[in-house]
Amino acid sequence: MIQPQTYLNVADNSGARELMCIRIIGASNRRYAHIGDIIVAVIKEAIPNMPLERSEVIRAVIVRTRKELKRENGMIIRYDDNAAVIIDQKGNPKGTRVFGAIARELRQLNFTKIVSLAPEVL
């Protein structure tokens, strides 16, 4: 469960290391975002000499949460961290690599490019 002011790790090589959520897209009064939701975030920590800089406002899709994700078959998945992948306005990832495992639910939400870049899909 991600809400405004939550810090997230960045799971790609776009140049940012840490994000802070400032808004959940498509939710006027929704409090929490889950895996597959798009958020507006600000970069809190970035790698020097990369295209993305600190305090830049970007969009990202959540790929991992510490809150459990329950599937229809009864399986429960929980990750070790909260992580997101930075995307552009069309929904394509800004980085060329994705680090760590991501949830299968992203494929159903039409983030197929992110799923194809991921080393492991759970």
Curated annotation (Swiss-Prot):
* Binding partners and assembly: Part of the 50S ribosomal subunit.
Question: Primary place of residence?
Answer: plastid
Q: Which HAMAP family would you find in this protein's record?
A: Ribosomal_uL14
Q: Where in the cell is it found?
A: Plastid, Chloroplast
Higher taxonomy: Eukaryota, Viridiplantae, Streptophyta, Embryophyta, Tracheophyta
Q: Which gene encodes it?
A: rpl14
Query: What family does this belong to?
Result: Belongs to the universal ribosomal protein uL14 family.
The protein's name in its UniProt record: Large ribosomal subunit protein uL14c
Show the Pfam families listed in the entry: Ribosomal_L14
What does the record give under GO molecular function?
Answer: large ribosomal subunit rRNA binding; structural constituent of ribosome
Which PANTHER family does this UniProt record tie to the protein? 50S/60S RIBOSOMAL PROTEIN L14/L23, LARGE RIBOSOMAL SUBUNIT PROTEIN UL14M
Annotated Gene Ontology cellular component terms: chloroplast; cytosolic large ribosomal subunit
- Described function: Binds to 23S rRNA.
InterPro entries from the entry?
Answer: Ribosomal_uL14, Ribosomal_uL14_bac-type, Ribosomal_uL14_CS, Ribosomal_uL14_sf
Organism in which the protein naturally occurs: Fagopyrum esculentum subsp. ancestrale
Q: Which UniProt keywords apply?
A: Chloroplast, Plastid, Ribonucleoprotein, Ribosomal protein, RNA-binding, rRNA-binding
